[in-house]
From Swiss-Prot:
Keywords (A to Z) from UniProt: Chylomicron, HDL, Lipid transport, Phosphoprotein, Repeat, Secreted, Signal, Transport
Protein name: Apolipoprotein A-IV
Disulfide bonds: none
Annotated organism of origin: Neomonachus schauinslandi (Hawaiian monk seal)
One Gene Ontology cellular component: high-density lipoprotein particle
Location in or out of the cell: Secreted
């Protein structure tokens, strides 16, 4: 049942709090996914939307999954579960209201922009062209970096596998002692190289967010002369556009990271298999090492093929979102189901605010809890 998956995710988020900062984005995603799932499943919504029942199940699962982990986790549970439950209730109640507000906002915007419809459409088209020019080099650079670092990863791991084969031929009489360090080092190299791969590729998403902000600001300035009486409404629509575009950037980052982690998960077991066969005869071990090299090639090549096109796909998605804005502001838009992105943006803003307040309070409490240093006077010798 989806509800149990949501509760489990919230529990895991809280458990990791002792080792790392709890992510507001994680909690917002859990609540939003839960809301979206229930919105698409009327029967489950009827069964599980009551606040009291949701709170009860969340608290019960916290107790079942984490028990007495530490004071921080216990405190987080007490604050997070009621907050998440209340936020979900507000989402449900605000959805239709916000939908109507966005409909009226777009109607007023269209009416004000109608006398300048052709100019507005041209300005947005120019902005799309500028966006394409800005993002094009990033897509090409991402593909180049994927190819470069994937090839580097392949070369380093293949070289280590070849060292294993060489050592095998030179130390037939003492395989386990000679090869064990190499097998252990191979696993460490896989972890290290995959982390370096992620480190080189994931920053692209943050750079793209800067370009998105620049492009949306350019669009706002170009449309401002046509929306003098409704500038606030135009700004609101552009905020929604920027949110959607940045969400795509976050998804790009997550997809790159997930593919790198998947690559690691496929490579590490093979290294462990080789280590496990050190007690086997030489022929079996040679066969395993030969399979290791080909397996490394296949998995790295698969990663390269999967991740390489992500930049172009990302660019197309952003251009489509700007085109959708042009259609929404045009005279023939009709009804547009646009409120959900604004609802999600509002949700994430509230979660970020909640976590900022919680973090500030935790820091203040820690300062208060630190006892003052007291010096015990030492009697002077007479």
């Amino acid at each position: 049942m989806f509800l149990k998956a949501v509760v489990l995710t919230l529990s895991l988020v809280a458990v990791t709090g002792a080792q790392a900062e709890v992510s507001a984005n994680q909690v917002a995603t859990v609540v939003w996914d839960y809301f979206s799932q229930l919105s698409n499943n009327a029967k489950e919504a009827v069964e599980h939307l009551q606040k009291s029942e949701l709170t009860q199940q969340l608290n019960a699962l916290f107790q079942d999954k984490i028990g007495q982990v530490n004071t921080y986790t216990d405190n987080l549970q007490k604050k997070l579960v009621p907050f998440a439950t209340e936020l979900h209730e507000r989402l449900r109640k605000d959805s239709e209201k916000l939908k109507e507000e966005i409909r009226k906002e777009l109607e007023e915007l269209r009416a004000r922009l109608l006398p300048h419809a052709d100019e507005v459409s041209r300005k947005i088209g120019d902005n799309m062209h500028e966006l394409q020019q800005r993002l094009g080099p990033y897509a090409e650079e991402l593909r180049t970096q994927v190819n470069t670092h994937a090839e580097r990863l392949r070369n380093q791991l293949t070289a280590h596998a070849q060292s294993l084969e060489t050592t095998l031929r030179q130390n037939v009489d003492n395989l386990q002692a000679s090869l064990t360090p190499y097998a252990d080092e191979l696993k460490a190299k896989i972890d290290q190289n995959v982390e370096e791969l992620k480190g080189h590729l994931t920053p692209y998403a943050d750079e793209l967010k800067v370009k998105i902000d620049q492009n949306v600001e350019d669009l706002r300035r170009s449309l401002a002369p046509y929306a003098q009486d409704v500038q606030e409404k135009l700004n609101h629509q552009l905020e929604g556009l920027a949110f959607q575009m940045k969400k795509n950037a976050e998804e790009l980052k997550a997809k790159i990271s997930a593919n790198a982690d998947e690559l690691r998960q496929k490579l590490v077991p093979v290294a462990e298999v080789v280590r496990g066969k050190l007690r086997d005869n030489t022929e079996e071990l040679q066969k395993s090492l030969a399979e290791l090299s080909s397996h490394l090639d296949r998995q790295v090549e698969e990663f390269r093929r999967n991740v390489g096109p992500y930049g172009e796909t990302f660019n197309k998605a952003l251009l489509q979102q700007v085109e959708e804005l042009r259609q929404k502001l045009g005279p023939y838009a009709g009804d547009v189901e646009d409120h959900l992105s604004f609802l999600e943006k509002d949700l994430r803003d509230k979660v970020n605010s909640f976590f900022s307040t919680l973090e500030e309070k935790e820091n203040q409490d820690m300062l208060v809890a630190v006892p003052e240093l007291q010096l015990t006077p030492v009697p002077l010798e007479s």
